[in-house]
């Protein structure tokens, strides 16, 4: 399995992207140094999402980073993606692990759920929202440092923080012991996404 740099995990959210070219955005994010790319395409059909994933995969393969499909294990298997990210309402984790050898990420609802997911074999946890976010309207109440740290300390697998993360609070997030940060709108809506990636990574290293 490839070595994964979790520090900057980008989500290519097609709803946030709007009419902009997803392949051009992917190239810009890769040029900026992201370590993981998730494709989240809730506003597209399965066919459209599959076609987009197939177009993105050669780019992520060249960059040697994983492409993770949001929610849909069947689609991840069909296109040969490196991973899938699941939530509490998606396919049960034990079934996912039994049928998929790639990366499985999970968004837990609290410490006990995070520990349960780790026992079922997930590879990483996406925990949030850290702060208030408008990207995912059903994200729930912000965890803040205390809530995030509680989950990080309760598991051994990598934890990436998501939700309301901007350059000004990267240090707060990193102080919780996370493996990395997940950024959506602050990258996709940046004037220069490549530069925005580099700035996030610079803040993460500070």
Curated annotation (Swiss-Prot):
Q: Which SUPFAM superfamilies does the entry link to? A: Thiamin phosphate synthase
A molecular function GO annotation: magnesium ion binding
Task: Name what cofactor the protein needs.
Answer: Mg(2+)
GO CC entries? cytoplasm
Q: Which reaction does it catalyse?
A: 2-[(2R,5Z)-2-carboxy-4-methylthiazol-5(2H)-ylidene]ethyl phosphate + 4-amino-2-methyl-5-(diphosphooxymethyl)pyrimidine + 2 H(+) = thiamine phosphate + CO2 + diphosphate; 2-(2-carboxy-4-methylthiazol-5-yl)ethyl phosphate + 4-amino-2-methyl-5-(diphosphooxymethyl)pyrimidine + 2 H(+) = thiamine phosphate + CO2 + diphosphate; 4-methyl-5-(2-phosphooxyethyl)-thiazole + 4-amino-2-methyl-5-(diphosphooxymethyl)pyrimidine + H(+) = thiamine phosphate + diphosphate
Please give the family membership noted in the entry: Belongs to the thiamine-phosphate synthase family.
Report what the protein is called: Thiamine-phosphate synthase
Q: Which organism is it from?
A: Herpetosiphon aurantiacus (strain ATCC 23779 / DSM 785 / 114-95)
Q: Which gene encodes it?
A: thiE
């Amino acid at each position: 399995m490839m070595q994964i740099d979790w520090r900057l995990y980008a989500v290519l959210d097609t709803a946030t992207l709007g009419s902009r070219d997803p392949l051009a955005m992917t190239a810009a994010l890769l040029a900026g140094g992201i370590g993981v790319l998730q494709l989240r395409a809730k506003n597209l059909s399965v066919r459209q999402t599959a076609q987009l994933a197939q177009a993105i995969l050669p780019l992520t393969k060249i960059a040697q980073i994983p492409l993770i499909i949001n929610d849909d294990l069947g689609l991840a298997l069909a296109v040969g993606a490196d991973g899938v990210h699941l939530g509490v309402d998606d396919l049960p984790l034990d079934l996912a692990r039994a049928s998929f050898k790639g990366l499985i990420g999970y968004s837990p609802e609290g410490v006990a759920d995070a520990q349960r997911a780790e026992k079922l074999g997930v590879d990483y946890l996406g925990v949030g929202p850290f702060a208030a976010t408008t990207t995912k309207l059903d994200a729930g109440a912000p965890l803040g440092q205390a809530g995030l740290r509680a989950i990080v300390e309760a598991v051994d697998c990598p934890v990436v923080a998501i939700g309301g993360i901007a350059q000004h609070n990267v240090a707060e997030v990193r102080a919780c012991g996370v493996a990395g940060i997940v950024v959506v709108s602050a990258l996709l809506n940046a004037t220069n996404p490549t530069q925005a990636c580099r700035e996030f990574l610079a803040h993460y290293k500070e």
